[in-house]
Amino acid sequence: MLASFVHNFVLITLESTPDVLERLLDGAADADPVWDRRPDPARFTLREIVGHLADWNGVFMERITRIRDEESPDSVARKVEDIARESGSFVAAPADSLARFRATRLAMIPILRALEPNQWERTGNIVGHPVASGAVSIESWFVQIAGHDGYHLQQIAQWLKPTFEKE
């Protein structure tokens, strides 16, 4: 179990991610071609990143609330592309995805803050993922969200470097 001060720092990190994301992307209008550049063919564009982050707030919250409310629930692993196709997030206006990310993240924070110490240790099962199958605690999902945010924020920072802006 993480120490309470660590929980608080991670909560602050999760709560501030919408501000950091918006600050990194400030000044790019929805029609700006920067949203659809793909400097690395194996990774997301900026448009896809913000849509993906908004989508996964929902995925993470569903998993966390099910683990909180049910006894060892199973969650079937889903492909990122399938979720994006269902939500339309990879083609959505970036401003809409950013607003959805902010709204869903800010809805997540009070749920996480309200968890009792014993609830953080509750687990659910991931089924059908080649790497991440098995029991996963709420606390592990909590840390995963912060890591997931950090991974994509780092990608955005790379994409926006002057060397990547040249085509």
What kind of region is each of these model predictions?
Residues 11, 15, 50, 54, ...:
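Short amphipathic alpha-helical segments with heptad-repeat character
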Residues 13-17, 23-26, 83-122:
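Acidic/histidine-rich alpha-helical segments that form the ligand environment
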Residues 33-84, 123-167:
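Short, contiguous alpha-helical
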Residues 16-21, 25-35, 39-41:
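Long, hydrophobic N-terminal alpha-helical segment
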Residues 9, 33-37, 92-98:
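Short helix-to-loop capping/linker segments positioned immediately adjacent to catalytic or ligand/cofactor-binding
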Residues 1-14:
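Terminal targeting/low-complexity segments that flank the catalytic cores of oxidoreductases
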Residues 20-27, 59, 63, 70, ...:
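Amphipathic, soluble alpha-helical interaction motifs
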